[in-house]
Amino acid sequence: NIYVYKFNRYQLEYTAADDYTKLYGVSALEETFCWTNSEITELACGLYPTDYELTIDLAFEMPLGAYQDNNNQVTVYLNGKDIGARTISGENNGQALHFYVNEEDVIDGRNILTIRSELWDVSLIGNDESRILGIPLESVHFAPV
């Protein structure tokens, strides 16, 4: 297989709708979002060295009842470095996830953002689909701080 990716040296905002081809580990685009369908999802992003607030926007609330503990742990890495974990629970379901990125973890130019999340079986919510999904990813934003 040959994969072709368009890469912008510096780009701070990524949406599933506009940057779908830069994402790995996601299902087909559904309007403005895509489900992660692998425990590991990656996004190639163009950053310049500085500190950032990273925001991951979810498209909507998730069916937390499909998870064993009624929550989903999301861990984020930049270039292999763990930058934090957040738990999606009933209190924050559907809300954006926020992380702090240190300048020393940023490479000038191409960086790999990795999102690790638990998967759930769609059939557990009474649906006759056989898909295994993670989080409904809508957008990723890097805001310099």
Per-range role (PLM):
Residues N1-V145:
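C-terminal luminal/periplasmic domains and tails of membrane-associated envelope-modifying transferases
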